[in-house]
């Protein structure tokens, strides 16, 4: 903390020195314009504009920029102080549904030795499925979310108390258990599984053909 304060004070001091140097440069510019114009005290509008812009730059460096730097340091400090053990909010209904469906599709495609779907295809399938699920299925996801929020609020209170009294806090493994919902189990096989299983049919036929050919060869080879 002391190092941060020292470096900040050094930065502020440097900015003030820069401000003073810029002011001196502006005054020197005015004197230069006077000499260049033959010693006349008259300064043109363009010259005054150039000096004004220089002074505005000084003001920005000495005040606004310092405030921005301090705000940036404060923001970085808040990010660094975020505790990874702090309880995390549960997934919303849609994101929990998305998690479940992604897991279901991944399992089905892995069983069939199929490559993963592209992000576009996966997101499109998830959106279509979410738009078509029944109110009862959505109610099931809402209940899961509400139950998870109850646990989250309890854990959040425990965590805040541990910060006050200095006691240890041990977060639960997961506030929201990522299990596949009943709605996906019931309806997924009717439509999405067709996408998963259809490319597999040629493989099955090929395996049967290979077995028949092996039997024929073994039959010819026997006396």
Swiss-Prot record:
GO terms for cellular component: cytosol; nucleolus; rDNA heterochromatin; small-subunit processome. It is found in: Nucleus. SMART domains: HMG. Residues 87-160 bind DNA. GO terms for biological process: chromatin remodeling; DNA topological change; filamentous growth of a population of unicellular organisms; negative regulation of G1/S transition of mitotic cell cycle; nucleophagy; positive regulation of double-strand break repair via nonhomologous end joining; rDNA chromatin condensation; regulation of ribosomal protein gene transcription by RNA polymerase II. Keywords: DNA-binding, Nucleus, Transcription, Transcription regulation. The keyword Transcription regulation applies. Residues 69-89, 165-223 are annotated as: Disordered. The keyword Transcription regulation applies. Transmembrane segments: none annotated. It comes from the Eukaryota. Transcription factor that binds upstream of hexose and ergosterol metabolism, as well as cell cycle genes. Activates pseudohyphal growth. This is Transcriptional regulator HMO1. It comes from Candida albicans (strain SC5314 / ATCC MYA-2876) (Yeast).
């Amino acid at each position: 903390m002391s190092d941060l304060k020292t470096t900040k004070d050094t930065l502020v001091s440097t900015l003030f020195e820069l401000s003073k140097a810029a002011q001196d440069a502006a005054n020197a510019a005015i004197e230069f314009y006077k000499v260049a114009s033959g010693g006349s005290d008259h300064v043109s509008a363009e010259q005054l504009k150039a000096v004004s812009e220089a002074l505005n730059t000084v003001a920005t460096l000495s005040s606004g920029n310092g405030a921005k730097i301090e705000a940036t340091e404060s923001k970085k400090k808040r990010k660094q102080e975020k505790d990874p053990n702090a309880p995390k909010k549960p997934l919303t209904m849609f994101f929990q549904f998305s998690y479940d469906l992604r897991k279901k599709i991944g399992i089905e495609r892995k069983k069939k030795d199929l490559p993963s779907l592209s992000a576009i295809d996966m997101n499109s399938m998830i959106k279509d499925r979410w738009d078509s699920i029944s109110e009862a299925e959505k109610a099931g996801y809402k209940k899961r979310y509400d139950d998870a929020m109850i646990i989250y609020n309890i854990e959040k209170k425990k965590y805040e108390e541990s910060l006050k009294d200095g006691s240890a806090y041990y977060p639960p493994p997961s506030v929201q258990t990522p299990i596949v919902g009943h709605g996906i189990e019931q309806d997924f096989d009717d439509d999405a599984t067709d996408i998963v299983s259809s490319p597999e049919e040629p493989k099955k036929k090929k395996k049967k053909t290979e077995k028949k050919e092996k039997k024929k060869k073994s039959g010819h080879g026997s006396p």
